[in-house]
Design a protein with these regions (language model features):
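Conserved N-terminal catalytic core of the sugar/cofactor nucleotidyltransferase
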Residues: 1-7, 15-129, 134-140
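A short, conserved acidic/glycine-rich loop-to-beta-strand motif
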Residues: 144-147
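Glycine-rich FAD pyrophosphate-binding loop
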Residues: 12
Length: 147
C-alpha cells in the first residue's frame, strides 16, 4: 500500500446543537446536494488515493448512510477501497471506550495502521469544505524527503 488516507469522522459535533442531535457532523447537508463528508472523499478520489479508512464513532449509522459502501466515489472494492473503522477500545479508560480526540483515535488504531504498512499516511477531517489535489502535496512531500 502506497498511501493510506484516514478520514476522521468520529467527533460529536456538539457545537452544532440540534443539527447533530440525530446525525454525525460529517453527515450534515451542504448546499442542499452534498454532505460535509463528500468533500474529503471526493478530494481523495480525484487525487488518485483509493485506500481510504473512515474512523467513525458517534451516530455511526448516519455516516454509513452517506458512505453507501464507497460506491459514490468508486471505492467499493475487494482490495483497498473504503474501510470503515469503529472505535478501538484498549482498556477501561475513557468514556466507554470512545476516542478522546483525534490524536487518541490515531493512537488507538496504531496496530491496524502498522499492519497495513502504508508508505505514507494522510490524515484528514471529515467535516472540512475545500478542494485540494493531494497528489501535488504528496509529490512535494516526497521531493523534500520529509518524514
Amino acid at each position: 500500500m502506497d498511501v493510506l488516507a484516514l478520514v476522521l469522522a468520529g467527533g460529536r459535533g456538539s457545537r452544532m446543537g440540534v443539527l447533530t442531535q440525530d446525525r454525525a457532523k460529517p453527515a450534515l447537508p451542504f448546499a442542499g446536494t452534498y454532505r460535509l463528508l463528500d468533500f474529503s472523499l471526493s478530494n481523495l478520489r480525484h487525487s488518485g488515493i483509493d485506500d481510504v479508512w473512515v474512523l467513525v464513532q458517534f451516530e455511526t449509522q448516519s455516516i454509513l448512510d452517506v458512505l453507501a459502501g464507497g460506491r459514490p466515489w468508486d471505492l467499493d472494492r475487494s482490495h483497498g477501497g473504503l474501510r470503515i473503522v469503529p472505535p478501538q477500545q484498549e482498556s477501561d479508560e475513557g468514556e466507554a471506550g470512545w476516542h478522546a480526540g483525534n490524536a487518541h483515535a490515531l493512537y488507538a488504531n496504531r496496530r491496524l495502521i502498522g499492519n497495513a504498512a502504508p508508505e505514507l499516511l494522510l490524515v484528514m477531517s471529515a467535516d472540512h469544505v475545500y478542494k485540494l489535489d493531494y497528489s501535488v502535496v504528496i509529490a512535494q512531500h516526497r521531493r523534500t524527503g520529509a518524514d
